[in-house]
């Protein structure tokens, strides 16, 4: 590789990926219920580069956008289908999922950000998220798609390719990025869509980077997940590099490592964006898109460490941090969007 091409901006340019990339994690999910129309419309109108989503499949074979394996955290499934409150998404038909309220939980969890109009928001299909991404000619975000628990959904990689192809989303380079924690799914995604950029997500624990402590959170007996992960590190340098090599061998153009958040909390994990790690990625021709940071102090630290893009629940904050042109206020936008 020539000397100039192993820096992040050059790698990103070669893949037609914005640099640094603003990846709206489940939409603008700090200000609106994750993975709903409100969150994705808000992220689009703020100017995010990508709408990030998690893909699963219904009992009747429709691709839907849900993060958790079960529906209890982000819907009223316990009231609607009490005997199936802990059933996986794949046990429900699309009609059943559409009958759930995927917004009211947010109003209860975050009263300071609650809006009456969030009640009764629905779970979305992949088609509906594509419609949102295409809905404003002035704001055209790409899609950053994770295949969730791919073992549970055999053939989801081909199904995704067929859908993206049918919607004309495989024609423009860099418009779609595919992401997975699963090396087998990475290989299958690469087989189906060799030309589409792919990211291997990294964390420390089961089925990923082996921890120096030899412990997984589940076996640690600890209560606080964030502080447990904040202390975890790869078994050694070589273990981390092995995963970079696996990403490269599987067809990835980058990795998606976790990070520690300065305020810890639910989405804080191990620090896998130390400068030497990012440098090792760049030396292998891999971009680094870190998940999931929401505060300026963490944005600054990550950029200083050499990352090429950030997954964030606060796309507006990150866009302002990058001083992108005129980022409107979230509250005003939500109002204009009818929320």
What is the role of each PLM region?
Residues 1-339:
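Phosphate-group recognition and catalysis centered on beta-loop-alpha active-site segments
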């Amino acid at each position: 590789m020539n000397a100039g091409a192993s820096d992040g901006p050059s790698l990103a340019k070669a893949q037609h990926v914005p640099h640094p990339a603003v990846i709206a994690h489940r939409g603008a999910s700090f200000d609106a219920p994750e993975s709903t129309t409100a969150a994705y419309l808000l992220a689009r109108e703020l100017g995010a580069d990508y709408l990030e989503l998690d893909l699963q499949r219904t009992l009747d074979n429709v691709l839907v956008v849900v993060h958790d394996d079960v529906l209890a955290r982000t819907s009223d499934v316990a009231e609607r289908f009490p005997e199936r409150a802990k059933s996986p998404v794949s046990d429900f038909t699309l009609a059943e999922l559409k009958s759930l309220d995927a917004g009211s939980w947010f109003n209860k969890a975050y009263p300071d950000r609650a809006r009456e109009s969030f009640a009764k928001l629905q779970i979305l299909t992949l088609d509906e998220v594509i419609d949102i991404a295409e809905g404003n000619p002035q704001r055209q975000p790409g899609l950053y798609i994770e295949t969730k628990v791919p073992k549970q959904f055999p053939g989801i990689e081909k199904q995704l390719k067929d859908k993206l192809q049918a919607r004309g989303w495989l024609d423009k380079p860099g418009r779609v990025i595919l992401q997975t924690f699963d090396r087998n799914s990475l290989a299958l995604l690469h087989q189906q869509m060799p030309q589409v950029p792919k990211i291997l997500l990294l964390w420390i624990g089961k089925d990923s980077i082996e921890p120096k402590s030899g412990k997984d959170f589940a076996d640690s007996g600890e209560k606080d997940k964030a502080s447990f992960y904040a202390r975890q590190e790869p078994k050694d340098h070589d273990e981390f590099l092995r995963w970079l090599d696996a990403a490269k061998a599987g067809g990835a153009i980058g990795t998606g490592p976790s990070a520690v958040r300065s305020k810890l909390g639910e989405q804080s994990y191990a620090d896998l964006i130390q400068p030497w790690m990012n440098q090792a990625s760049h030396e292998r021709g891999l971009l680094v898109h870190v998940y999931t940071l929401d505060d300026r102090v963490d944005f600054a630290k990550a950029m200083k460490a050499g990352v090429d893009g950030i997954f964030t629940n606060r796309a507006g904050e990150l866009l302002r941090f990058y001083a992108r042109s005129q980022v409107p206020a979230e509250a005003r936008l939500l109002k204009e969007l009818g929320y």
